[in-house]
């Protein structure tokens, strides 16, 4: 192969690489990663007890523990009592536990499950899993602690002991902080 031909191939390869990279960056979907420190995405879901639509905006000014779960999820079942204890201990105008079921079942099935477990905090139903998608959840249970300003402060993948000292201290601190 001649020297000129080698240079032509090398320059062509570099140009193809640069053009391909630029094209990939341009056509790549722009996805904002949901992470600690970012604004919590707005959501809409139905309250299983009242049937009324609920949005994250309705909780503005409160600290929210948003929990994504399903009735068929064993770790979710294990986690629910600690969410209930935390809600009873700290639930007020300044803090709310909001549990969103992604079950395919009817609202009545999810509501019956919540009654069976004695849950008194807000239970929403999102059978389309739009909230799971908006929050880029990988499974259930998955939870986010959102401050009064709508910013994600903590994310937990998997079950947690929500009424344990570390989690409770975080929630208390956030409730005591004024909104900005």
Question: Across the structure, where does each feature detected by a protein language model lie?
Answer:
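N-terminal targeting signals for export/organelle localization
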Residues: 1-42, 165, 180
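Structural microenvironment flanking redox-active thiols in thiol-disulfide oxidoreductases
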Residues: 77-117, 127-134, 169
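Conserved hydrophobic/aromatic "anchor" residues
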Residues: 43, 59, 68-69, 113, ...
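Thiol/disulfide oxidoreductase modules built on the thioredoxin-like
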Residues: 112-119, 126-174
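Active-site acidic short loop of glycosyltransferases
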Residues: 60-62, 92, 119-120, 137
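Short pre-active-site segment immediately N-terminal to redox-active cysteine/selenocysteine motifs
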Residues: 62-64, 68-72, 139
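Hydrophobic beta-strand core positions in alpha/beta domains
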Residues: 65-67, 99-101, 145
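A short beta-strand-turn-helix
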Residues: 43-64, 87
């Amino acid at each position: 192969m001649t020297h000129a031909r080698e240079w032509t191939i090398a320059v062509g390869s570099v140009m193809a690489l640069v053009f391909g990279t630029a094209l990939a960056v341009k056509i790549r979907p722009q996805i904002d990663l949901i992470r600690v420190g970012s604004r919590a995405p707005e959501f809409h879901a139905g309250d299983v007890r009242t049937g009324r639509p609920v949005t994250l905006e309705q909780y503005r000014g409160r600290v929210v523990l948003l929990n994504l779960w399903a009735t068929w999820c064993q770790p979710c079942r294990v986690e629910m009592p600690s969410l209930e204890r935390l809600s009873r201990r700290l639930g007020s105008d300044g803090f709310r536990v909001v549990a969103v079921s992604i079950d395919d079942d009817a609202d009545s099935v999810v509501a019956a499950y919540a009654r069976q477990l004695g849950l008194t905090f807000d239970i929403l139903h999102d059978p389309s899993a739009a909230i799971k998608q908006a929050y880029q959840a990988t499974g259930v249970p998955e939870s986010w602690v959102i401050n009064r300003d709508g910013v994600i402060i903590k994310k937990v993948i998997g079950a947690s002991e929500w009424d344990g000292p570390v989690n409770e201290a975080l929630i208390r601190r956030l409730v005591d902080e004024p909104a900005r």
